[in-house]
């Protein structure tokens, strides 16, 4: 496989040392190593700038926001997330996860630039929260109509869930989406190939947003101290 961009999650110092050879192949990167299972590393063959690591709802949970410069001059917003799951050992409720996802989604909805969002969202594609995120952001799920692509848990074939996601704006068409073989992690890697084709891409239908969706999303976002306006907007362009 020869991807243009690699996104690694749950990275720590050990992982950073093991991933260091990638610096020779991927000259641009954004790294945030943490020992709490929420580290994040992004490697790119293309220039990354206007990049920022943020802690939107939790001082220990990073997210990454950046511009990817394509060789032909195209600029793409890339957002990488790994929100906290609802669980007895992490967070009893899904408040933080939902709020972070929806805040980023609302900031994306105003973007004039093409957008890709990737990460372990600790939620399945058909959940109410994921569907609400898609309505608020306007992004598309390339899996729709193509299968589940369950990525967790790689060690238990009888119990797997699609927790790792790639969403994209209507500027793109999907060329291929694959779950790659087990590489030793408890998550399978995912490979997505997107083609910039805005004329054809705009024919793809996103989920329709209603006023009640906006009200519910705002209610969830109000449960934290941050707001959609706090999300870094790489490229600085918004629809008028």
Regions found by a protein language model. Give the residues of each.
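Acidic/histidine-rich helix-loop elements
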Residues: 87-94, 155
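Alpha-helical scaffold elements lining the catalytic groove of polysaccharide deacetylases
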Residues: 92-102
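Structured beta-strand-rich core segments of catalytic domains in phosphoester-bond hydrolases
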Residues: 5-83, 180-181
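Active-site beta-strand/loop signature of hydrolases that rely on acidic residues for catalysis
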Residues: 1-17, 77-81, 100-133, 167, ...
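Active site of divalent-metal-dependent phosphoester/diester hydrolases
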Residues: 27-42, 60, 124-184, 188-189
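N-terminal, active-site-proximal structural segment of metallo-dependent hydrolase catalytic domains
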Residues: 1-20, 200-240
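Residue-level detector of structured alpha->beta connecting loops
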Residues: 2, 45-47, 112, 138, ...
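Solvent-exposed residues in well-ordered beta-strands and their adjoining turns
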Residues: 69, 195-197
């Amino acid at each position: 496989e020869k991807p243009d961009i690699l996104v690694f999650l749950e990275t720590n110092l050990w992982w950073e040392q093991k991933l260091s050879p990638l610096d020779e192949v991927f000259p641009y990167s954004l790294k945030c190593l943490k020992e709490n299972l929420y580290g994040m590393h992004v490697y790119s063959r293309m220039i990354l700038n206007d990049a920022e690591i943020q802690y939107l709802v939790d001082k220990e949970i990073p997210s990454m926001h950046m511009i990817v410069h394509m060789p032909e001059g195209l600029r793409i917003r890339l957002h990488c997330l790994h929100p906290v799951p609802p669980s007895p050992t992490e967070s009893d409720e899904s408040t933080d996860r939902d709020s972070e996802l929806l805040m980023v989604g609302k900031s994306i909805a105003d973007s004039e630039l093409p957008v890709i969002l990737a990460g372990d969202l600790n939620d399945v594609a058909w959940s109410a929260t994921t569907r609400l995120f898609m309505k608020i952001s306007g992004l598309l799920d390339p899996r729709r109509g193509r299968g589940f692509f369950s990525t967790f848990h790689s060690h238990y074939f009888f119990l797997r869930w699609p927790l790792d996601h790639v969403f994209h704006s209507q500027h793109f068409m999907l060329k291929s989406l694959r779950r790659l073989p087990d590489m030793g992690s408890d998550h399978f890697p995912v490979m997505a190939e997107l083609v910039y084709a805005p004329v054809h891409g705009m024919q793809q239908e996103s989920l329709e947003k209603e006023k009640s969706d906006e009200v519910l999303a705002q209610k969830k976002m109000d449960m934290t101290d941050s707001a959609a306006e706090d999300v870094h907007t790489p490229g600085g362009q918004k629809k008028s």
